[in-house]
């Protein structure tokens, strides 16, 4: 089991390095560093289980927690901090209800914690923006799913606008 995860991680890291040598993503100066966003909550008991769209185990309670978003708005790998509680998150998942919405879905380990969070508008600070090329690479493997196609179209548009 561990060797399969290690192989997935090696493939992802290799693909990431290839993708990073491609065109630049949206220029950092054009992206906000602080914003107020709508957040919702999800847990591993929902469809998809305890693994993210990147293949990593969903995380909570450590240095960095897992989050999901529409990758055409907030690309995979984006790290942010919720200012009210100082928790840091990384976008490594997506969900059908997030496509076309500027909402972040935060991972919680239990249904009780998920319901306690509910829906909140919070101020976040972007620690590091993620990668549209890596988002594209990961989404392109799942284009048979309609909401993934919609997200991929948005990612492709971002890439087309910012690549020469």
Feature-to-residue mapping (PLM):
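Solvent-exposed, well-ordered loop and adjacent helix/strand elements within mature globular domains
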Residues: 23-164
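N-terminal export leaders
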Residues: 8-12
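N-terminal secretory signal peptides that target proteins for export/translocation
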Residues: 1-5
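Hydrophobic h-region of N-terminal signal peptides that target proteins for export
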Residues: 15-24
């Amino acid at each position: 089991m561990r060797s399969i995860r290690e192989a997935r991680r090696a493939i992802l890291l290799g693909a990431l390095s290839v993708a990073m040598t491609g065109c630049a993503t949206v220029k950092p100066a054009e992206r906000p560093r602080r914003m107020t966003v709508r957040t919702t909550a999800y847990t591993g008991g929902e469809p998809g289980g305890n693994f993210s769209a990147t293949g990593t185990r969903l995380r909570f309670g450590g240095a960095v927690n897992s989050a999901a978003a529409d990758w055409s708005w907030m690309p995979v790998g984006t790290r942010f901090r919720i200012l009210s509680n100082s928790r840091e998150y990384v976008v490594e998942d997506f969900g059908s209800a997030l496509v076309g919405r500027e909402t972040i879905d935060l991972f919680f380990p239990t249904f009780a914690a998920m319901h306690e969070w509910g829906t909140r508008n919070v101020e976040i600070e972007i620690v590091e923006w993620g990668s549209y090329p890596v988002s594209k690479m990961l989404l392109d493997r799942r284009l048979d799913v309609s909401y993934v196609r919609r997200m991929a179209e948005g990612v492709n548009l971002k890439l087309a606008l910012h690549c020469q």
